[in-house]
A protein has these predicted regions:
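Acidic, metal/ion-coordinating pockets
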Residues: 1-135
Length: 135
């Protein structure tokens, strides 16, 4: 019996959610919102991000500098249905407090073996995930 799974993987979004570069405000074929609506999620689907989400765009800068909170970014990732994510090097740019607030607000699991807190604990060193079809 054939069993299938779907994996949607993003990486290096750098806070580009909206389909614009913000410079000229023209609609462009880019940004997480331009394709996340195509995620067809069911019990045999995983949505994963490879990091570098918190820094890079005018929107990400606004979240950090003006609101001081990554809540809006976490809300977007939650709404897109991310199951797992890891941390990229630019996710450390705004400090550990900001990053920890993001981890707390994100409903997915942060899987990252090579980053530990001051007590030596990793976010989740690994995850074993069983899909609805048993895979």
């Amino acid at each position: 019996m054939e069993q299938t799974l779907k994996i949607y993987f993003t990486s290096d979004v750098h806070g580009y959610f909206y389909p614009t570069t913000y410079g000229d405000l023209k609609r462009k074929d880019l940004g997480l919102f331009s394709f996340a609506r195509d995620f067809k999620k069911d019990e045999n689907t995983l949505v994963i991000d490879g990091g570098d989400i918190l820094q890079g765009s005018a929107f990400a800068y606004y979240c950090r500098q003006k609101s001081g909170s990554p809540q809006a970014i976490a809300d977007i990732m939650n709404d897109c249905g991310y199951d797992y994510y890891t941390l990229g090097n630019h996710d450390f740019n705004y400090g550990m407090d900001y990053q920890n607030a993001y981890i707390e607000a994100h409903h997915g699991a942060c899987v990252c073996q090579n980053v530990v807190d001051e007590a030596g604990r990793a976010c989740h060193p690994y995850v074993i995930h069983t899909l609805g079809n048993g895979l």
